[in-house]
Amino acid sequence: MLTNEQIQSCLKREQKALKHCYESCAPYLYAIIRSYIYDEENRKDVLQEVFAAIFSSLSSFDINKGPFKPWIARVTVNQCITYLRNQRKLNLFVPLDIESYTGIESEDKILNQFSRQDMLKYLQRMPEGYRTVFVMSVIDEYSHKEIAKTLEISVGTSRSQLSRAMSWIKKHLTVELNITKNG
């Protein structure tokens, strides 16, 4: 990632340092964006917004409080959520009685059945609302309370969306694995 000296150079708005920051961090941040945003062109737009946010708020980054990588990851996730909110795509969240999902297997049991590559492949096909909560919960390890606050939904809706996402994954990956085995 970046050294403390390079971060200090970015704070001074040195063009060479800003360019290096972009070139070294863009692939990592783009991978995060891919988890949230389906459309390629929109991903590129969000990546630009992420760097604008990083560069404009770089002065708030405190080297003594923690590493740079998690800080820029958090900025990226926040920008993705802001983008989705602005696109009104988060209206896909439908409140659901969580009790109706008590028969679903645990997250770990479902996730351990499939490779990471399979998961990433199907993540892009998952409905937006499910995918957002799934990524925040499983990949970014947000609590349901944090997800609810960030997305402005209830904790129950967060749980139900994750349950629906897990069911969706299980259904689609199981079908794919059966086709692969029998095909």
Language-model region placement:
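N-terminal module of bacterial RNA polymerase sigma factors
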Residues: 1-27, 171, 183
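C-terminal edge and immediately downstream basic/flexible tail or linker adjoining helix-turn-helix-like DNA-binding
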Residues: 6-9, 91, 149-152, 166-183
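Short, charged helix-capping/linker segments at alpha-helix termini
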Residues: 11-20, 30-49, 155, 178-179
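Sigma70-family region 2
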Residues: 11-12, 51-65, 87
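Amphipathic, Lys/Arg- and hydrophobic-enriched alpha-helical face
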Residues: 22-41, 57, 73, 123, ...
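Arg/Lys-rich amphipathic alpha helix in sigma70-family domain 2
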Residues: 60, 74-94
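Internal acidic/polar
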Residues: 82, 90-116
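A short pre-motif secondary-structure segment
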Residues: 133-137
